[in-house]
Amino acid sequence: MITPAFELSQDADFLIVVIRVPYTRTSDFDIYIQEEEFKFYAKPYFLRLTLPGRIVEDGREKASFDIDKGLFTLHVPKETAGQHFEGLEMLTSLLAPKGSRSAKPLVEDSEACGEGCEEEDEEFDWQIEQEVYTEAPADTLKEYHKYGFGNLRSGVFSRLQEELNEVIDMKDPDNTNAELRRRNRLDTETAVFCADHYLVNLYEDKEEIRNLLKFKPWWRKLNPDPSAGYDISMTFTEEEREQMRRFTNRSYLLDKKARFHVWLGLVDIILAYVYDVRTTEGEHNVESAWTIRKLSGTLSWLETYHSVQDVLVSFGRRTYCYPLYRHFSLVTLAVKDAACIFQAGKACILKCLLAIHKIFRENDPAYILNDLYITDYCIWIQRVKSKHVLALAEPLNNAKLQKNHLELELEIIEQAAELAVKEEEEKDTESDTDDSSSSSGDSDDEDDSDEECPEKAAEKKQTAFKAHAEAVTEAFCVELQRGDGRLIEELGKRLEEELTIEEDVPQERRSASEGEGERRREHYHPHAAESERDTTKAATGKELLDVCLQRKPLRILNTEELDSDDDDDDDDDGDLRITVVDERG
């Protein structure tokens, strides 16, 4: 027989059952309704449900069949109109037979069954008084070497040594008692804690942390009413419903202490899950399986807790040691998120557990944690009382977790960091002051240099001018040493006079001096030019176009370029030959 896919919903008067039976004959089906039991048969499908409320067959039943979709819809009257049936989303629990509500118990104990059922109805005192740990005798240590859901497993890791190191953080759990696991966990957390990573998140990643804190996960949109006293109705996807149908019904015979550990382990796992959802902003990634099992001491160290405060401290410490974002605001907000989920009821918790189950199922070898914890939690949570789930929301909402509870010296580290920041700021301030003083001194020096600059420039110019004049005069003397003495004297005087005029006249008065020099040249031209022409002609025997140095360029030719006769004449007479070229023609 095939168990068909189905969904349950309700209104004030009817229980609505939708069954998917695509391969059946619509004219051949049977329905059985009696008190809490509902049965449906249409070959080859068979469905049996044990309901949380009583139904009745009184003629108001309605049925319809959608041939295209293969959906069979039944409206079954409630015995008490207006009654709310809890847990209609818990498909695994509904499939269990009446009475045992289990296909095959995980642990059978016929004598303790009735007692166990009564204990499940007892109220939990979450402020239970803690007992001081005492070392157990050696002959009783074996009972502590268990782990898994309700400490019902042992010997699992002895068969899975290769996968051990990749799944949990401890070695040889089968031979390690609970107290030693805890000590080793605390020592490891203290050793791997990185103050630098924490300070980077605290001071440099403020924007990223702020965005994560603003993110609103799906459970924040539920707005559960604390006074309602029942679960919020949740919608499960087809994949989630299919996974619930695959679970095998089991009976968990747990004593009061074991059930207490199971509830605290559930809080620990949910905290790790909500942290991953927030830090990935609802988009689980390839690191999600690692993050969830690392943040949960239950999953990574097979830890068993003794109070809600123990769970919160462990979660806070591991949040500061392993994930990418390590910030106290993320820890406190994760606690509020977990409280919101427990306030919404067991259907909301089941949805979270199914998400974790899927993440681990798709990650090798994290699937081992499904076998040890998550699958059992998914089955167990469907059958617990809603009041126990809602009761856990209160201690989470009222939790007072502080940094000093984590025993990682966070406050000392922050104080040291603040002092370092202040010292750095003081150094920067002193450096800025020195820079401004230096800039002020440099500015004064520049002002003084700007005032002295014109005088120095004038002195340099005069010195260069004198050197140039002396060089030109010397060059003329060397070239004209064999020339007419009178011509040399006149040329030297004229050049000296012109250079003197250029030296004495300031830069801003050059235009006036140039005009005066032009007038002098005009005055000199009628007489001196004629005298120079006659003298040169007498010495060289050649007519010169113009010898006025103020108007025409003077070119002194090398005597080696002259004729040999001229050289002889020069040797005999000592006359100078000068050629003046008129560049106008």
Curated annotation (Swiss-Prot):
MF annotations from Gene Ontology: unfolded protein binding
GO cellular component, one term: cytosol
Cell location: Cytoplasm, Cytosol; Nucleus, Nucleoplasm
GO biological process: box H/ACA snoRNP assembly; protein-RNA complex assembly
InterPro entries: CS_dom (IPR007052), HSP20-like_chaperone (IPR008978), Shq1 (IPR039742), SHQ1-like_CS (IPR048696), Shq1_C (IPR007009)
Protein task: Required for the quantitative accumulation of H/ACA ribonucleoproteins (RNPs).
Compositionally biased spans, kind Acidic residues: 423-435, 442-453, 560-574
Family: Belongs to the SHQ1 family.
Main location (coarse class): cytoplasm
PANTHER family linked: PROTEIN SHQ1 HOMOLOG
Basic and acidic residues bias spans: 506-536
Keyword Manganese: no
Record's protein name: Protein SHQ1 homolog
Keywords: Cytoplasm, Nucleus, Phosphoprotein
Keyword Phosphoprotein: yes
Signal peptide interval: none
Region (Disordered): 421-461, 495-541, 556-585
Post-translational modification Phosphothreonine, affected residues: T536, T540
Domain CS: start-end pairs: 1-89
SUPFAM superfamilies per record: HSP20-like chaperones (SSF49764)
A Pfam family it matches: SHQ1
